[in-house]
Amino acid sequence: AYPFTSQSTYLLTFDNHNSVNGIREYALARGAHVKYLPVLPPRLRVAEDRLDEHLALAREDGHNLFAYPAQSNFSSVQHPLEWILKAHAAGWDVLLDAAAFAPTNRLDLTAWPADFVPISFYKMFGYPTGVGALIARRQALKKLQRPWFAGGTITVASVQGEKHYLADAPAAFEDGTLNFLNLPAVTIGLEHLESVGMDLIHERVRCLTGWLLTNLKEMKHTNGKPLVKIYGPVDTKKRGGAISANFFNPEGAVIDHSWIEQRANLHGISLRTGCFCNPGAGELALHILPEELTSCFNRPDHEQRLTYDEFRLCINAKASGAVRVSVGPVSNFADIEKFLDFVRTFLK
């Protein structure tokens, strides 16, 4: 619904969830320019001078959209909220993906007036799945142009008259029947977070994450080789509570992340493995080269379909993903110690 045209630019960081990456297809279909702003290994942060260069690409005669996550769902890097004001000054609308940030951090939209802010209630308090929200500034919402209509989004529609009238925003963007059976849970969840306090939640997660990072960094095989390689920040400065890493044997070869997940399941530990729907950060962290990807995607048998297992074979047995462990408001030190005990089983 964003009014992309051939005079528009869609700028996004390499570090973005696929839900944000996918917007590029709408932009390209309308002739807009799409630009990616890289993050730099090993910390997976953006260089400020590169940001300034890319923000200068705003087209004066078109709508420009800059999208980035407040917190990476791959590395847990917390990108500066100050970018919002900098981008506005350079002529950009800003989409701030706060899905990973909002569960454990206070976000003041008066101080940081992003135009569009998607959040996930499931990530904030674990229930219900499939219910989120797009928080949009009124002026930004007026820019959106729905390319179609559906039930629940119009006041009047006619077949013979070939006409429809959209409902006032935000109802014009809420397709179908709202999930009224689960929506009351959102109120309960928000009240619970408020009763605990976001500052307390933030500090608790920071302490647990710091303890986990410290212990993972210290784990070494008997020959001195590190067991764990952490992607992104190795301390708690400007980072969230998810840690992405790979495990290595004493010879320095990566241990397959899928196998680690299977082992974790047997120990009653829930992990996420893969690239976590964030291919840009994953490709840079794992040193997957553009030419390797091009060679893989251009194979005749990969024109229409490519499974994840086929992709893993295609990139010469490089690590195609990582292991992610997430610390949240209900995590405690016993959870951390159980995970660390599990990790120690890989030491040789």
Language-model regions: role of each:
Residues 1-348:
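Pyridoxal 5′-phosphate
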